[in-house]
């Protein structure tokens, strides 16, 4: 691939149930086509949590570079928004080196955040939330109206309205269409074989 074409390099997303062969497929394809793997799993991001997390083996990492592993300690906060930010930078980095990025998982929210370009709002402010929770639903609607905050679809649910306020009105966070230049491969396996 020419370096001027790296933005045209697709993101290959491989999804499927546990033990369906996602990782082995990704490794084989990445070896053949010159790719690197970003693990989209909410457990593998944690350091020192190697048991029960299906982290790639040392041998797998030697065959193909893997990213998204051992990013934070278990006592540290790590959100889907942070995963999205990390992954987008990593995808850009992989493409800039004329490699193909593979996003493999795992955790649906992590995958969807990239594929559907989720817009994450601000982190919740405990003091502000406490004040908002004391208001009636009608007072929350009035607050939204005065502050040009579009009400969520479920505007009768106080919790949804409060979260919408915290996010500054970003409540339609999921696009219906997949982002451009993404190829999604879904693996299905007979339940008896799992």
Residue spans for each PLM region:
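Phosphate/pyrophosphate-binding catalytic cores of soluble transferases and nucleic-acid-acting enzymes
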Residues: 1-194
